[in-house]
Amino acid sequence: MLQMRARPWVVILAGGEGFRLRPLTRSISGDDRPKQFCAVVGTETLLGDTRRRAALVAPANRTLVVVSKQHECFYRPLLADMREPSVVVQPENRGTAPAVLYALFRIAKLAPDDLVAFLPSDHFVSNDQVFMAHVSRAFEGCRQQTDLVTLLGITAACAELGYGWIEPGRPVAGFHFADFRRVRQFWEKPTVAQAEEFQTQGWFWNSFVMVGRASTILELIKQAVPSVYEAFAGVRPMLGTRGETEAIERLYCGFPAVDFSRNVLSAVAADLAVLPVRDVYWNDLGNLDRVIATWRHLLEDAIPQIMPNKLPA
């Protein structure tokens, strides 16, 4: 009898504060909301855009959205169509590592060997189909090599100082997909000279889009930040019960902020792979300059369609 292949999961990370863009989101929406709950680019919120992308690879019942309780007035209307268990509510925002762990333990309690993709909720992607085809390819790579955890690396368009960079290493051994490379090192906040060299060498921007088996990612987190892992493991029996909310509130009370990129990924770089993303404009919309650059990109793309006869010869 044929065994059905389990559909993957998608976790959308939407618990951040987005303080640097608050003046812009305030002028657009009229209130003090984080950027993921605002229509920063186009007519849809960034969270809505991310949910649309997620639906290309995972059904609604395998999509989780991680939010922070203090943003309830913003996320509740946007997630009204989702079943309550699919909305993972953190009592407070404690950084990306707790958000990732909370969602992973939820999934691992149901299906620890299922594949999971993590998508930030506040990025711009010019072509959903092309971008998510890379996510699907990462899923396929993880099916071929079950201990693989893959990050999508964005082909660098400039020597960006504000992004994290991924230095690729050798191709993944014993693997028939030649474009998957081992991660040699992560670089944060490079100098101008370093960033120019990184771009010349063909290194990648870190998109923070990550794909792997729930159990494998959990094991890497356990290696990197064992105390954080054990704290969440202690409340695992309460997940999915009436006591979950109270247990999570106790856990988060006084819990330190832990950054997933800095505290986890950098510590286990040798165990990760990177898959290059090409033919897509991507921007993390982390500050006003990047938002303006994205607006400019959209305008430049639109001009040939609006005024086809006005292009220079």
Feature locations, PLM:
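Conserved core of the sugar-phosphate nucleotidyltransferase
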Residues: 127-255, 269-272
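A conserved hydrophobic position in a structured secondary element of the catalytic/binding core
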Residues: 67, 119, 190, 212, ...
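Hydrophobic packing residues within well-ordered alpha-helices of enzyme cores
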Residues: 21, 75-76, 195, 217, ...
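Conserved N-terminal catalytic core of the sugar/cofactor nucleotidyltransferase
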Residues: 1-15, 20-34, 39-136, 140, ...
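Conserved beta-strand scaffold positions in the cores of enzyme catalytic domains, especially
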Residues: 37, 87, 149-151, 274
